[in-house]
């Protein structure tokens, strides 16, 4: 049942859900439905609207009636269309990742006792150690 969702990124799952709902949705509803933080829902909506050209959306801004919070608005979003090209692009990316993983040679680990002080610090500060 879940196999179809494993390869899809969160933004696409959210967009598909919004399109199936066929109504205006706010970030709070997304955070509740997908059990994610509100800020992550807001950031995902922003990503869908600004970066993903294959997803067509309509946007409405409704001002909050809260006093003392400045000019904050609620953003209502409705997904109109999801282009089929996005699925082809994702399939190609997943295939490339699989091919890349298989061809990547395994680099033997160097014991820490063989590294000098500078090399140890360099290793600790490298991006690969922060993952």
From Swiss-Prot:
One Pfam family, short name: CaiF_GrlA
One annotated GO molecular function: DNA-binding transcription factor activity
Annotated GO biological process: carnitine metabolic process; DNA-templated transcription; regulation of DNA-templated transcription
Record key words, sorted: Activator, Transcription, Transcription regulation
Gene3D superfamilies with a match to the protein in the record: Winged helix-like DNA-binding domain superfamily/Winged helix DNA-binding domain
Top-level taxon of the source organism: Bacteria
Keyword Flavoprotein part of the UniProt annotation: no
Function of the molecule: Potential transcriptional activator of carnitine metabolism.
Record-given protein name: Transcriptional activatory protein CaiF
Taxonomy of the source species: Bacteria, Pseudomonadati, Pseudomonadota, Gammaproteobacteria, Enterobacterales
Gene: caiF
């Amino acid at each position: 049942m879940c196999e179809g969702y494993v390869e899809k990124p969160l933004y696409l799952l959210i967009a598909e859900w919004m399109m199936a709902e066929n109504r205006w949705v706010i970030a709070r509803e997304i955070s509740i439905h997908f059990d994610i933080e509100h800020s992550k829902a807001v950031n995902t909506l922003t990503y869908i609207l600004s970066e993903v050209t294959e997803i067509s959306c309509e946007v409405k801004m409704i001002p909050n009636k809260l006093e003392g919070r400045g000019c904050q608005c609620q953003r209502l979003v409705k997904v109109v269309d999801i282009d089929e090209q996005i699925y082809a692009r994702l399939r190609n990316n997943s295939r490339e990742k699989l091919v890349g993983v298989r061809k990547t040679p395994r680099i033997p680990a160097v014991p820490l006792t063989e590294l000098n002080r500078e090399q140890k610090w360099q290793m600790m500060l490298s991006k690969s150690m922060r993952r």
